[in-house]
Structures are given as C-alpha cells and as structure tokens.
C-alpha cells in the first residue's frame, strides 16, 4: 500500500505508544516520517531505522522540545527541508499529572498546557503555510475522552484536551477551502507508558 507515497508526515510524541503507531501506519502507506519525542538514543534509533527497514521509506528524528515554539517550527522545517513537503501533521505529544486542584503544582499546570495544547497550536501555525502552498494537507490532533468529559484530579489535562477540541474545530473552519482537513481523535485508555502509570494495581489484576 503506497497511497501516501511522496508525502511527509510529522508526528509529535512518536517515539513510543500511540505516536509511534501513527508513524508506522503512515509509513506503511508510503509516507516519509519525521519522528519526535524523548527516550534513550539507542531506543529512538531502533524505532527510526525500523521504520525505514520495515516500510522502505525515509525517517528522521527531531528532538524538538514541545515547550519551545522555535524548536517546533524547526521540526516542521526539517520535514520540508529533508523531504520537500509537510503534508500531514499529527499533534500527539502529551504528559499527565494527577493532583487535587488545591495542591496542583503551578509548574505542572504550565507544562501540561504547553505540551498538550500549545504545542499543537505552534505546530499547526508552522505547517499550514506549507500545506496551503501545495493545496493539500491533513492535520490530526490526539485529543482524549477527556476532551468530552471531565475527571477529578486532572485539571490541566482535561483543560488541555478540551482546548484541543476547540482548536481543531477552529482550524478546520479556517483551512477547509485550501483542501486541508483538521480533525481530532479522542481515545479512551490505551495501554501506553503514559497511561500505565495511572492505572491502579487493582485494575491491572
């Protein structure tokens, strides 16, 4: 299957979990990939080279920090400069912290909003001009069931995911006439390193 041959997908938070699954799915459809995320260098290289070997596409890794707008712009530019286009952007990076609201650390709030919400804005802002130039683009934002409902002790995460839903709708209206779509996916629990830390031992049994 090579429906996306010649196209480039930039996927944030893609060195493990849902993001890596996105990246491998797009590679399986023929797209070149810009991976992004943290991890041990050897582990990242294993995933990067594995994508190239398994799917016969090109794959590079951007270490862009999702709290830094300039680095996010550089990540998008890496796709354009390396592969000639940025056709697909997946905003998937995310972190979590659980605490009662009165004890919620300010720095944790700021970090979650920056990574889970603001990074998507910065990525979209950087990618849309490339997509408009080509007259085609796909933007996918990973929201959550928490973009639809609330959950106690997750004030920042729930606020960010509700924000992702609103951002998605707004961008979709703005870019539709340019043959660019913007959608979000709202999964529930998916067994990833992020979620595993949240599941009580009683639920694992």
Predicted features by range, described:
Residues 102, 149-156, 177-178:
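Active-site loop immediately N-terminal to the catalytic Tyr-X3-Lys motif
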Residues 8, 15-16:
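Conserved glycine-rich cofactor-binding loop
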Residues 29-46:
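Conserved glycine-rich Rossmann-like NAD(P)H-binding loop of the short-chain dehydrogenase/reductase
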Residues 129, 173-174:
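Alpha-helical segment proximal to the catalytic Tyr-Lys
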Residues 124, 160, 168:
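Active-site helix of classical SDR
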Residues 100-101, 108-113, 203:
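Substrate-binding pocket helix/loop in short-chain dehydrogenase/reductase
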Residues 144:
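Residue(s) in the substrate-gating loop at a strand-loop-helix junction
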């Amino acid at each position: 299957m090579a429906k996306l041959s010649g196209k480039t997908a930039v996927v944030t938070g893609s060195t493990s979990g849902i993001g890596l699954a996105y990246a491998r799915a797009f590679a399986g459809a023929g797209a070149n990939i810009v991976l992004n995320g943290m991890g041990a260098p050897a582990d990242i290289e294993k995933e990067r080279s594995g994508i190239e070997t398994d799917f016969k596409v090109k794959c590079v890794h951007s270490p862009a920090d999702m709290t830094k707008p300039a680095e996010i712009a550089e990540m998008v530019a890496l796709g354009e400069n390396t592969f000639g286009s940025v056709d697909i952007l997946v905003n998937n990076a995310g972190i979590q912290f659980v605490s009662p609201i009165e004890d919620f650390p300010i720095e944790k709030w700021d970090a979650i909003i920056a990574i889970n919400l603001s990074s998507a804005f910065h990525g979209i802002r950087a990618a849309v001009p490339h997509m408009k130039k080509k007259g085609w683009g796909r933007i996918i934002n990973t929201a959550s069931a928490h973009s639809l409902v609330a959950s106690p002790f997750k004030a920042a995460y729930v606020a960010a995911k509700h924000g992702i839903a609103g951002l998605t709708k707004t961008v979709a209206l703005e870019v539709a006439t340019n043959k660019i779509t913007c959608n979000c996916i709202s999964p529930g629990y998916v067994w990833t390193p992020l979620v595993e830390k949240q599941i009580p031992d009683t639920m694992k049994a």
